[in-house]
């Protein structure tokens, strides 16, 4: 990470970015941090977490805000209206990660390939909560600045053609998972080379309860 750090006010994410691990900030602030669209940033409230950065919506420019969804807010231990610090992340390719259901009473079975396909391009830290999906959005975001991302996403058309979740049970894309372990033990990005292991039983999370319904969920219902 660089030494440059900025402080921004947390506001809710829009539906297009919900549960995809994406944060939006002013492009001028991105330049200050030395990051481009698709790079990783550390967001820290009472806990540090990591997200992929995109530029702010035009109406948000100059407002000093960061748009993150309920999962990222939980991961950063920050609420809407809180101030968080934001800095450039030093992110490595994940060699191996272990995930487990984050909600008690849930058991999940699935194969490594299907799980990995649902997390491609995602940046995570140990203890983060994640949701499967959002792969195409992440690839589009990262490819615009960085070119083809085959080393991360592989043949994404094949993945998306089959939805990538063939080895998982129905409704799994709505399940929240906790990242129980990462190798190396630092901020990482999940790629097609990452080994993803599933602990089928829910793990105890010592921090606050995982949100079952977030502001973005409610916003989505209102839009329907």
List the predicted regions and their residue ranges.
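Short, low-complexity N-terminal leaders and the immediately following helix N-cap/first helix
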Residues: 1-10
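Eukaryotic beta-rich interaction modules
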Residues: 6, 21-24
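AAA+ P-loop ATPase mechanoenzymes
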Residues: 27-31, 36-223
